[in-house]
């Protein structure tokens, strides 16, 4: 048994383990920020629904749909719990829904740009970033 465990541990590459942990953390961060931004946009436009349901939180457990998360790892796509929005609170419901829907993807774009800038700083002394 001990020999088996030693073989298993030697086969583990700590770099790939760290890579997997960072990927999972990035997924949790992106899903959480994405859904929170939907709620913040709705709140800014007059809809308190997400706030009253405690969904304006950076706590990933409030936003993660466990089946959607599993699908993300198994199939390469997934989802989170959608933030509830009531368009009746918006002065212009169609425009409010469009802006609220746009807030999530915009947050993903901003996070991607930040990640790119951080990686440029980290790998500044290298010739290329992969």
Label every PLM stretch briefly.
Residues 1-130:
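Hydrophobic transmembrane alpha-helices and their immediate loop junctions
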């Amino acid at each position: 048994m001990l020999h088996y465990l030693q073989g298993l541990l030697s086969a583990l590459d700590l770099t790939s383990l760290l890579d997997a942990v960072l990927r999972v953390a990035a997924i949790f961060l992106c899903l959480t920020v994405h859904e929170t931004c939907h709620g913040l946009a709705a709140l800014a436009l007059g809809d308190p629904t997400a706030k009253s349901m405690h969904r304006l939180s950076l706590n990933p457990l409030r936003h993660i749909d466990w089946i959607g998360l599993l699908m993300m790892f198994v199939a390469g796509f997934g989802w989170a719990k959608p933030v509830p929005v009531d368009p009746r609170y918006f002065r212009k419901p169609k425009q409010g829904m469009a802006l609220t829907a746009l807030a999530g993807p915009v947050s993903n774009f901003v996070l991607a740009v930040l990640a790119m800038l951080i990686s440029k700083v980290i790998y500044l002394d290298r010739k290329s970033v992969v």
